[in-house]
Swiss-Prot record:
Coiled coil: none annotated. GO terms for biological process: mRNA splicing, via spliceosome. Signal peptide: none annotated. GO terms for cellular component: nucleus; U2-type precatalytic spliceosome; U2-type spliceosomal complex. The keyword Nucleus applies. Belongs to the MFAP1 family. Residues 134-148, 181-198 have a biased composition (Acidic residues). Residues 1-34, 113-203 are annotated as: Disordered. Widely expressed. This is Microfibrillar-associated protein 1. The keyword Nucleus applies.
Amino acid sequence: MSAPSALVKQPPIQSTAGACPSRNEKGRAVYGEGEGETVCVGKAAADYVPMESSEEEDEEFQFIKKAKEQEVEPEEQEEEVANDPRLRRLLQNRITEDVEERLARHRKIVEPEVVSGESDSEVEGEAWRVEREDTSEEEEEEIDDEEIERWRGMMRQRAQERKTEELEVMELEDEGRSGEESELESEYEEYTDSEDEMEPRLKPVFIRKKDRITVQEREAEALKQKELEQEAKRLAEERRKYTLKIVEEEAKKELEENKRSLAALDALDTDDENDEEEYEAWKVRELKRIKRDREEREAMEKEKAEIERMRNLTEEERRAELRANGKVVTNKAVKGKYKFLQKYYHRGAFFMDEDEEVYKRDFSAPTLEDHFNKTILPKVMQVKNFGRSGRTKYTHLVDQDTTSFDSAWGQESAQNTKFFKQKAAGVRDVFERPSAKKRKTT
């Protein structure tokens, strides 16, 4: 049931006017015949206490006080209600609750009950309370009329506001779509925020000062990174330009080289050459080349055959062959005599296959400081490179014993004795000259 219908169409109040109330054992007022004494309206109860009141009377008093407070400043209250939608909603709910409570109270049917006899004071108190209820009902009816008028004014104002809102909605129809999108975004943000709030919180971790990154440091780092990127772009552009320049220079060089080659070919004059003479000269050079290759090949084959023949000879035949046909030594030099502590120079082994006078010189002749007689020097100075970092320790090893008796080779043991007798060279009693081929032992 709506609030207007509840206020206008009130049900008839069922009452027992003119009946004599009486109290039962529970202290309630009942109407009708009973065993107890009856009390007529207008008689005061002897046990009435003016300062006492029931819960229902307290509620009525609070409601009347609230209504009077509302009547004090109706204009200000109506202005606040019109401006604030929350107050309007609160007032409407309050009016609805009051109407429902009043209807429930008026619909209460009081049935007659059989009560026991009570004292005259109780009957008089009940009569006074009934009279108080009648007067409060009249005041409530007056307050209800005022509330209805106030409620109708509020409804008219609300209808006017609804019309204004409908006009604004029609004017802002296009903007509503964007508003819905923003609202969806805000709802999504609220949803994400709520999700973030539901996430587990992490334990705070201490970060050292040198490892912290503040906003200024982050901005400085971003600026530095941007400068580095710009510098890298600049260097890449310079490299590209330098590469293009090098390619252009190389292309120019190749073009100039081709031009020079063509110019040299054009400048070559071959009109005066005789092709027959050139061909005859080439034939002579080719024949000499062929002859030289054949002679080298024959000499190599002859040398291999001689080596094979010498290998097949016995020891006596080989000695006789060497005595009869001595070995021919090319560029044989005269063997000279070296002086005391004279430096030795080797003439080398290359290019000795053909006789040359320069290779036949005496290379044992003294040079530079070797002309001096070093035998007259003191014993301590008779060493090579005396006074230098490369000086030798001994003059020569003829008079020096360099045997190391502490080494493993100098120890007398069964293993060393067996090695010296069977494998060591120069320590056995019998000496056999090794041959070119290994002899087969049967």
